[in-house]
Amino acid sequence: MTRANAAYYARHDPFADFTTAPEISQVFGEIIGLWAAVTWKLLARPRPVLLAEAGPGRGTLMADALRAIGQTAPSFRAALSVHFIETSPRLAAAQAASVPEANWHDSLETLPNEPTLLIANEFLDALPIRQFVRRAGEWTERYVQNDRFTELPCGREARISPSPCGRGPGGGGGRAETRPPPAREELFELRESAQTFAGSLGARLAAQPGAALFLDYGPTESSSGDSLQAIRDGRTADPLAEPGTADLTAHVDFAAFAAAARAAGAATHGPIPQGIFLTRLGLFQRTDQLARNQHPAEALALIDAANRLAEPNRMGWLFKALALCHPACPTPPGFES
């Protein structure tokens, strides 16, 4: 998954294959910018402050966010510097056209050691996963070999991988190993890269004022099952066919991600459905405001875009919002019970 996605983002325009929320409606980025501004105030207005985005795509979300911040929160705009976590030179070039003031980083660890507000939309789903299969109480780990899935018993995979699966999908001591053997085959996914990111970010947010907002897709609670998928030309595709020509993603384990951040010292809020989060932040009020000044067809398109982001049978329920923050920060906007 890591190599295939690296090749994909280096050679292809991913937005030819799928459309993300910032490309659907400008209101998405605007209200995320306002979320950051209000959260900055809740953190007692630290100066200077980093406004960072992990996996910023074309830079559309940040451009929309900065426009809204400049119009409504000039003191926050003056205090912030923009930082992108991006490993694709192709995407970095597109981001530079949208947000020329940005600074680029290969990882979270290379961000300046300053108070940080981090945004990540559809970032975690692209991080690599490991898959484990359990049959009759025995674990195997799934690999890709010669464009096919193959399995090796846990403990023998060290010949081809530096990261053995002896821990099992529980991540330490084999949490799932203590369960009774299932009556049928079960598949579990382990997201070590996401857990590492959560731990590093959680420690950063615990050490100084800061917050992070993640919008991505996956269940609220940890679950079993195969969530690996490939998207090519806007359609699902075989994840093993033509590596490097499709976007590979997997559902986010929000519960495990939040637990890793809390273990590092951060507070967490959510996850909650994206539709509820965006509605609380004024998605439809802002959309109606924009639609009033448009021709009827354009107004309908704006309203449909908002519905696409928030309706339960579209993106509103599968996609979730999760916030991490400094333990002393009050509840961030949108997460009030």
Residues covered by each model-derived region:
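Rossmann-like AdoMet
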Residues: M1-T116, F132, I276-Q285, L290, ...
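Generic detector of well-ordered alpha-helical packing
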Residues: A54, T87, F123-A126, Y217
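Charged/polar low-complexity intrinsically disordered segments
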Residues: E157-R159, R175-E177
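Long, Lys/Arg- and hydrophobic-enriched amphipathic alpha-helices
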Residues: E177, P182-S337
